[in-house]
Amino acid sequence: MREHRPIIALDFPSFEAVKEFLALFPAEESLYLKVGMELYYAAGPEIVSYLKGLGHSVFLDLKLHDIPNTVKSAMKILSQLGVDMTNVHAAGGVEMMKAAREGLGSQAKLIAVTQLTSTSEAQMQEFQNIQTSLQESVIHYAKKTAEAGLDGVVCSAQEVQVIKQATNPDFICLTPGIRPAGVAVGDQKRVMTPADAYQIGSDYIVVGRPITQAEEPVAAYHAIKDEWTQDWN
């Protein structure tokens, strides 16, 4: 099931900065928000409770990667926060991912990171010593994620079609690195526009700086949302 709201990456250093940003939006507007490591480490679990209390959906992007028992225990705690979605690194292995699923339960979506969108094929081959193509690595991780019983993966939009072919059409593909046409790509190596991401089959898109650093964030958000959903029936 595709998500009609672009997920806004709350890449802010403090609780107060988040409050100031969200104050720009109408109180009745329900958003889908990503809390990453920077914000979670700065504000703690209370940031999730605060966002849920405002009626927003929360993707807690912590990319857990540890031994299975530790990840399972951590996921039990995250499940109590009421997050709507969270993630692990697929590189942690099938047993770790199964443990994460068991710890989190079935109320929240659980997805895995394949290769970060900041990773190029040359970087992967040199630093991870994975001597395949980037796409082959991503497909391998996606298959293992499906095998472990997770809901989907984080991946580049360019990889969505091959991942769904290798797994199943309902396997979630969440796509970061989304940039409207004409916006600087920043540190992302593999990017795509919202309209292109829709056409290629992404289920969720994540957008950060083009919204949070825009002169008019609310207008930027709705422009991206309109582009993302313009061809929906």
From Swiss-Prot:
CDD domains assigned: OMP_decarboxylase_like
Keyword Hydrolase appears in the UniProt entry: no
SMART domains, A to Z: OMPdecase (SM00934)
Bilayer-spanning residue ranges: none
Molecular function in Gene Ontology: orotidine-5'-phosphate decarboxylase activity
InterPro entries xref list: Aldolase_TIM, OMPdecase, OMPdecase_AS, OMPdecase_bac, OMPdeCOase_dom, RibuloseP-bd_barrel
Keywords: Decarboxylase, Lyase, Pyrimidine biosynthesis
GO biological process terms on file: 'de novo' pyrimidine nucleobase biosynthetic process; 'de novo' UMP biosynthetic process
EC number: 4.1.1.23
Active site: K63 (proton donor)
PROSITE patterns noted in UniProt: OMPDECASE
Origin: domain of life: Bacteria
One GO CC term on file: cytosol
Binding annotation for substrate: 11, 34, 61-70, 117, 179, 188, 208-209
Catalysed transformations (reactions): orotidine 5'-phosphate + H(+) = UMP + CO2
SUPFAM superfamilies per record: Ribulose-phoshate binding barrel (SSF51366)
Enzyme class (EC, first level): lyase
Pathway in which the depicted protein is active: Pyrimidine metabolism; UMP biosynthesis via de novo pathway; UMP from orotate: step 2/2
Oligomeric form and interacting partners: Homodimer.
Family the entry assigns: Belongs to the OMP decarboxylase family. Type 1 subfamily.
Database matches in PANTHER family: OROTIDINE 5'-PHOSPHATE DECARBOXYLASE (PTHR32119:SF2)
HAMAP family to which the protein is assigned, alphabetical: OMPdecase_type1_B
Protein known as: Orotidine 5'-phosphate decarboxylase
Organism: Streptococcus pneumoniae serotype 2 (strain D39 / NCTC 7466)
Lineage: Bacteria, Bacillati, Bacillota, Bacilli, Lactobacillales
